[in-house]
Amino acid sequence: MDPKKIARINELAKKKKTEGLTAEEKVEQAKLREEYIEGYRRSVRHHIEGIKIVDEDGNDVTPEKLRQVQREKGLHGRSLDDPNS
């Protein structure tokens, strides 16, 4: 997210505590917060999708739901053509 938008979120939060927000500022704040949260969710999702879990013996124990997402995206050598990957 653009640093200017984050600064604006913080500015609106500070103003809300000190003097309150106008109706337009409340709408702007809600929109900016939603944009920030969506970006955060995308980042976390991307990070989790890149994880491969192995046990002490080196066996892949990644949950099947995550494996399916990785197959669809071709991550960690997984392929839709090979259901065992």
From Swiss-Prot:
Residues 62-85 have a biased composition (Basic and acidic residues). InterPro entries: DUF896. Keywords: Cytoplasm. Residues 56-85 are annotated as: Disordered. One of its GO terms (cellular component) is cytoplasm. It is found in: Cytoplasm. Belongs to the UPF0291 family. PANTHER family: UPF0291 PROTEIN CBO2609/CLC_2481, UPF0291 PROTEIN YNZC. This is UPF0291 protein SGO_0570. It comes from Streptococcus gordonii (strain Challis / ATCC 35105 / BCRC 15272 / CH1 / DL1 / V288). The lineage of its organism: Bacteria, Bacillati, Bacillota, Bacilli, Lactobacillales.
